[in-house]
Amino acid sequence: MAIFSNQMRLSSTLLKRLHQRVAAAVNSSSSRNFTTTEGHRPTIVHKRSLDILHDPWFNKGTAFSFTERDRLHIRGLLPPNVMSFEQQIARFMADLKRLEVQARDGPSDPYVLAKWRILNRLHDRNETLYYKVLMENIEEYAPIVYTPTVGLVCQKYSGLFRRPRGMYFSAEDRGEMMSMVYNWPADQVDMIVVTDGSRILGLGDLGIQGIGIAIGKLDLYVAAAGINPQRVLPVMIDVGTDNENLLKDPLYLGLQDHRLDGEEYIEVIDEFMEAVFTRWPHVIVQFEDFQSKWAFKLLQRYRNNYRMFNDDIQGTAGVAIAGLLGAVRAQGRPMIDFPKMKIVVAGAGSAGIGVLNAARKTMARMLGNTEIAFESARSQFWVVDAKGLITEARENVDPDARPFARKIKEIERQGLSEGATLAEVVREVKPDVLLGLSACGGLFSKEVLEALKHSTSTRPAIFPMSNPTRNAECTPEEAFSILGENIIFASGSPFKDVDLGNGHVGHCNQANNMFLFPGIGLGTLLSGSRIVSDGMLQAAAECLAAYITEEEVLKGIIYPSISRIRDITKEVAAAVVKEAIEEDLAEGYREMDSRELRKLDEAQISEFVENNMWSPDYPTLVYKKD
């Protein structure tokens, strides 16, 4: 009965979220205005003349009115035609479209890099217009400012570098970081994305060039979550690089030393964390693309003391859980059947282990959260790494992967052995889901996909989640051509839907972390939660899973369109705030203290979130002497 009641409790939570998607929001006549943003009051600036035109936070370009041009001493420094926001966007889009026509028949890399350069130049001179363009064209430009193009940008960053963005802390700065943080001009920082460049996407050690991924992530925090761009900070911690090509490159911008390791490495990260939380006690720090060796250790070291999370581990896991729950629905099964799903996972790095741990916890929660439940959940996973199937017979198993090592007697009954190939495991296990987090492009070969034909599921799910595109374990064309149309396909990188003929379309879902991390960050910020708890992450994943309607699920759609990212983020953030309140972690945000926050119902929480999402609009600027 305990197991049944837990199943029903989880199921009812998800059903409630599904019903909320259908039900219209009820507007109470006595509803309060929960916004704590500045609104449309004039903004005081302490710059004039060329200084204001060279400041991307305040520069409006040709949109400055004549009264502002007089006030700010910029009359005559701009062309006389005062252009509207819409006209500026149209001019910028015309430039990009001309580039698209010129590059249509050329190689793809120069094309996307040229687009990135144009967007980056706009970012450097006018942040408001940049984010307006990005928000209004998010489906087209998210792949340019974020994955997959950001991977190419990081590889070429030393050559592309023109103007600094963010902060750089290095091994040479030991003992100085506490004072260095005061070199950043913003007195308030809400969100930091930090990397050490050791494992950028699936591209390996890119050293200091990895800051490109932190910049791209924060662009999405602004565009999707409405974090104020003046309160975000991309950070690179340069502890050296083991990339021999970079060490030999005279144009490389980072330290040309091998990476620090052991206690020396930990001391640098500790000093950084102490410094940023001393200056900005309420900041949220997202760790990004740290190698597996350190990702879990740093997460466990800091998560109970600081407002931080690791997107590669926790964000990827949440997106995968939402997709797996969607796959259960798409297979025509009740949500509580999730613990019965057989899942083969290719990849045992930080992302793979993060997904495994989250899926195991979700299954165990459905089964009653007992020791027996955790053991039962463990038995639903088969993990394959570069050496093959991981079993208890494996020597020197990574401690994080050890809980998922298969027992010898179990696999012998299945006709498998230690080190069995992925194709052999898929053929014998007949899984409901094949999940790829290996960063090994093409790993789901024809042999592997042919083996999946024997799945016991009537609609098997394939998740090649590795980024960037070249690291995807398979393409949708390969999957649909071998397995037919009755599959669920979700990838980490964007792919176009596949024309299957006869008017049928193979839907390509994108299992993109951007569906979750902006909402997790925004919800943590607005709740004032002391930490980012497992419950808050679970609430985010369940909210995303419930966002898709039954009609969409039946068509094989388990993730929403990126064009809806702003609304998705609002709902995810509201779910995170609600969970933080229920766990008694919420301490409030600015004027909304914890007592007022606890009085809000679900509709009011959603309103509170929406009212505190920054939107790109030009404020009236008024000059005041320092």
Curated annotation (Swiss-Prot):
Protein residues bound to NAD(+): R199, A348, A351
Transit peptide, from-to: 1-34
Residue sites binding fumarate per the record: R91, R125
Annotated compartments: Mitochondrion matrix
UniProt superkingdom: Eukaryota
Enzyme class (EC, first level): oxidoreductase
E.C. code: 1.1.1.39
Residues that hold a divalent metal cation according to the record: E288, D289, D312
Alphabetical GO biological process terms: malate metabolic process; pyruvate metabolic process
Quaternary data: Heterodimer of two related subunits.
Protein family according to the UniProt entry: Belongs to the malic enzymes family.
This protein's name: NAD-dependent malic enzyme, mitochondrial
